Amino acid sequence: MNKIRLRNANYLRENFINYYDKFFEVQIADVNYVHSYYTFSFTLKEDCSFNRKMLSLHLESKGIETRPMMAGTLPDQPGLRNCNGIIVGDLKNSRYVRDNTLCVGVHPLLDIQDMDYVLEEMNDFLSRNK
């Protein structure tokens, strides 16, 4: 099952790097580690003409489930606001990732045709939101 998740994540990553580099940053996995992917995440670049919510709404309307990323911004969570803890820095990068990163699933029951559908809908969205 993990091999299929990895295949799906790598397929999306390769396509994002080759075709969507103008719009998104993607994680590059360290070759010295084995990763277990549940989602493929990508972060909007600062100069995008659209935001995460716009893209998420488009993908969701096409039956592609998306999720945001928490990205280490626990102090911003309502249930943790009154907890005492040490916060180092202003969490600027964590907040940027939280606000501009989107995740799509790479479940083992999804095949390459499903990944191609995600890419088709990305193309559709990007062609109208350059």
Predicted features along the sequence, with ranges:
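PLP-dependent aminotransferase class I/II
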Residues: 1-130
